[in-house]
């Protein structure tokens, strides 16, 4: 084709920084049971997108954990929620039934290549269009389920809340916590108490279900840089076990649990979660919001740069990427989500052979916002103000 043209041509040159949008974080994902749930609304082993949690309860039945968990979430907030319903276990005794239920929750890959149970959460985004970021299995998170949940959380870059399954004492809880080393998990003990409208009595209410809803609420109203701790919980009337807590006294039950990496429950101006720590074996991710900040920053930066993949590697492209990331960091800093962050291009990491192979390395660092876990007020008694008192009297 000839290059000759008698007239005007316009060539678009699409250069410059791109706007970077923060990934959505207030999306709950949970696995539940409900043998009497509406099978069309909640099919077995299929991720279901719920945009109105309170309305979905009408189709959740009364058996199993689904309806109670949905209500616990609805009491806190109105998050987008992905629900996975699995079949209840069968057997001659409760132990056998629970074992089968645990297997159903953990899931596998069936003969048709479809994921089931928790593993189906990995396909939730392709089915529902949203990626669950806040995960749990309220009321059924045995140690085996918690281990499986940790793996799913790592793959989705999500955060999971688990109970100290079967633990009755603080020493048992501390020992149970040693089963986990993942930064993506938080252990919570004990449970709440709440009114059960099915039995018309006060019953144990899964703390993990309320953690899912409250986490979403905090994300929506304050941000992912705020931990779960010290925020009022709705819809509960008590705590299922005695936990000694005092705002000023050290060495309390709550302190022992928090020090061991367990979040507990307290009553002070209502009921609250008390604790910031994850199960991480790396001190860099000691706090819940440190993990979530790492996840959000990583996903935000990666998802925002699909446009750059397969474009010619030029100085302009590199500058656009670096400038765009730094602009986003300034926004996050201004809004209080991070302390600060910087992105840069390293010549040492990007030599001729690297660029020739179609590879590009962009570096950045960031500082998450620490939670104020221990406030010390240093009080002193002095007589120096008495001189001012005498002076003020004589001046009148």
UniProtKB/Swiss-Prot annotation:
Record keyword Nucleus present? no
Record-level GO BP terms: symbiont genome ejection through host cell envelope, contractile tail mechanism
Entry keyword Cell membrane: no
Q: What is its main location?
A: virion
Q: Which domain of life is it from?
A: Viruses
GO CC, sorted alphabetically, is: host cell cytoplasm; virus tail, sheath
Q: Which InterPro entries match?
A: Gp18_domIII_N, Phage_sheath_subtilisin, Phage_Tail_Sheath_Structural, Tail_sheath_C
Q: Where in the cell is it found?
A: Virion; Host cytoplasm
Q: Which UniProt keywords apply?
A: Host cytoplasm, Late protein, Viral contractile tail ejection system, Viral genome ejection through host cell envelope, Viral penetration into host cytoplasm, Viral tail protein, Viral tail sheath protein, Virion, Virus entry into host cell
Pfam families, per database record: Gp18_domIII_N (PF22671), Phage_sheath_1 (PF04984), Phage_sheath_1C (PF17482)
Annotated signal sequence range: none
- Family label: Belongs to the myoviridae tail sheath protein family.
Outline the subunit composition.
Homomultimer.
Task: Say what the protein does.
Answer: Polymerizes as an extended helical structure around the baseplate-tail tube complex. During ejection, the sheath shifts to a contracted form, thereby making the inner tail tube protrude through the host cell envelope.
The entry's protein name is Tail sheath protein
**Which source organism does the UniProt entry give?**
Escherichia phage P2
Q: Gene name, please? A: FI
């Amino acid at each position: 084709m000839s290059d000759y043209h008698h007239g005007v041509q316009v060539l678009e040159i699409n250069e410059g920084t791109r706007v970077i949008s923060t990934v959505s974080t207030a999306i709950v994902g949970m696995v539940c049971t409900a043998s009497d749930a509406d099978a069309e609304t909640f099919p077995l082993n299929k991720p279901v997108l719920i945009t109105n949690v309170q309305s979905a309860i009408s189709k959740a039945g009364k058996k199993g954990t689904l309806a109670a968990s949905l209500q616990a979430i609805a009491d806190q907030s109105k998050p987008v929620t992905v629900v996975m319903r699995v079949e209840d276990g069968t057997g001659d005794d409760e132990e056998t039934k629970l074992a089968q239920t645990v297997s159903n929750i953990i899931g596998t890959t069936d003969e048709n290549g479809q994921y089931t149970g928790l593993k189906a959460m990995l396909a939730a985004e392709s089915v529902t269009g949203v990626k669950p970021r806040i995960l749990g299995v309220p009321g059924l998170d045995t140690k085996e389920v918690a281990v499986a949940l940790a793996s799913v959380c790592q793959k989705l870059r999500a955060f999971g809340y688990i109970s100290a399954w079967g633990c009755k004492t603080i020493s048992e809880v501390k020992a149970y916590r040693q089963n986990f080393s993942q930064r993506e998990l938080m252990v919570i003990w004990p449970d709440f108490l709440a009114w059960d409208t099915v039995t018309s009595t006060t019953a144990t209410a899964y703390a993990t279900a309320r953690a899912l809803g409250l986490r979403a609420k905090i994300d929506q109203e304050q941000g992912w840089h705020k931990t779960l701790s010290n925020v009022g919980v709705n819809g509960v009337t008590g705590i299922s076990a005695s936990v000694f807590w005092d705002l000023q006294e050290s060495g309390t039950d709550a302190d022992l649990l928090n020090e061991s990496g367990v979040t507990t429950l307290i009553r002070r101006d209502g009921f609250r979660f008390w604790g910031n720590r994850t199960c991480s074996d790396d001190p860099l991710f000691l706090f819940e919001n440190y993990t979530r900040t790492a996840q959000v920053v990583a996903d935000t930066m990666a998802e925002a740069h699909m446009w750059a993949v397969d474009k010619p590697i030029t100085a302009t492209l590199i500058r656009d990427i670096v400038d765009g990331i730094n602009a986003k960091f300034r926004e996050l800093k201004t809004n209080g989500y991070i302390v600060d962050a910087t992105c840069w291009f390293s010549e040492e990491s990007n030599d001729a052979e690297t660029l020739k192979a179609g590879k590009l390395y962009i570096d950045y660092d960031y500082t998450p916002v620490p939670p104020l876990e221990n406030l010390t007020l240093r009080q002193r008694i002095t007589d120096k103000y008495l001189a001012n008192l005498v002076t003020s009297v004589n001046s009148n």
